[in-house]
């Protein structure tokens, strides 16, 4: 399997025969936040997604247009998926980016994900709830990072490192600000995950995700704040793994054919 720049941690191993789980990170993160999950590929092939200008793609110009980014990522994912099964996971900004990309894969490539899991993200029809806008500049962003938590204090105290990171994070916010819902609805189930102590994304801002699918919707709560997916240990990943592997195996294109036949709709509710 050829390694694409968008998927830096994919190895040509037996995992390539498993159901793929494409993982989209939060604003300010990178594909590396999901690298710990790649150690546990007994049932899933974990595919962290790297954006332009990030970590392993640092030599590239950061993306700032969400719609263009969705188109680019969908093309790369389609090449990798081919006719295999896949599912999508997105945290915070990554939930909306992953949703839009999955919707384009379904509508333009005929590739329907097995499941979409969105974590720590308000539903698409609501305006962003962030206290920060990319036009406010770097100092305002530092204030927002302190308010949010999740950023190590030693990083916030390192001015040289901040000067390198802040433009990347602002680019992420610009991506998020340009990701607009344009009527997309997935034909696969959507599961929404929330942290019990997440004041940024309370349950009432999440339930609207049920309107983004013509299939089943499920809402689950987990211990932790906005960054609950990245708490130490494997408990959350194992729960996620169970969800992603719960449905019967069919290829992405086969599910697209099934979704166009009303008599086959019941398969979407088999859990």
PLM feature spans:
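Domain-scale detector for complete catalytic domains at protein termini or as standalone homologs
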Residues: 1-89, 96-271
